């Protein structure tokens, strides 16, 4: 059970690998609007969808039906299955299962905009005042109540990082086992000879904080920055870089082009607070060190150390342009970062290790039903 299929991104890569571990699995989602050229990872499976799929304007505005999603996910009849795996960052774990079934929920994150990020979500959505704001607050209140209740229907929680495991404990009062997401490190080639530019790459959305990276480099004209990615904030990023000849905005690029820039970059700069964060791991797979905002999943995936034989990057403590700029100075003064160490660290998050860990944890839940609840 996955929430929605609208593009092939991080959570869909997890689903892809779950399907490889359990190739006989049937697939359910609230909506499925994947383009034909993005469906390959489903292996020809038909996705069974909810009534939201057929509602007006669902293709482009399915998120507007958030208040209906708890009802929709509860309508799936999964009673014929011994094992149910939900891929959850919103409502997927709310599927109804019986006492004779095992429900394992792989949690990318609890529904952040209903919990600790509610106020940020309302602010960035322009829903701080007025009738719509109060309707949104009421909807999120009831969503929290539902989200808490449905946690009781999960037999075993899997978290995509220690950071998310702490969120699960805080939100649901449940322990979880950490199974890091699969990163296709084999797709990336380690390069030892680096060029004299820095790379930032992500979707251009507010929480990624791409503007602060561009602002930082605009104030350092002697240092080169390449920016890859597309999204709602792209025009803002372009405007910030308009008078900075040292900042090159490439927009969307293919994975092959991104991998090439990652391998050649002096360092990868990352300013988001992510629950896991795949791109910093991909950069390390290229032998490229990471300069990251020190919060969230990067504290588990990037190794900061005074020992050059152990370190793969360093952190800055505030999401500001000044903090990024100071981190660049610190990085350049730190001395050598070894590509081999970066690559070895990235291997901890390989597809092979994900499959092994997932299989072990699910088999454990199936084998010991009387003690599987955590």
Feature-to-residue mapping (PLM):
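Nucleotide-activated donor-binding/catalytic signature segment of Leloir-type glycosyltransferases, i.e.
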Residues: 235-260
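Donor nucleotide-sugar binding/catalytic pocket of nucleotide-sugar-dependent glycosyltransferases
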Residues: 112, 136-189
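Conserved donor-binding/catalytic core segment of Leloir-type glycosyltransferases
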Residues: 189-226
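A charged, aromatic-enriched C-terminal amphipathic alpha-helix characteristic of glycosyltransferases
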Residues: 319, 333-363
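Active-site donor-binding segments of glycosyltransferases and PAPS-dependent sulfotransferases
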Residues: 21-93
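Short hydrophobic beta-strand element within catalytic cores of glycosyltransferases
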Residues: 289-294, 299-302
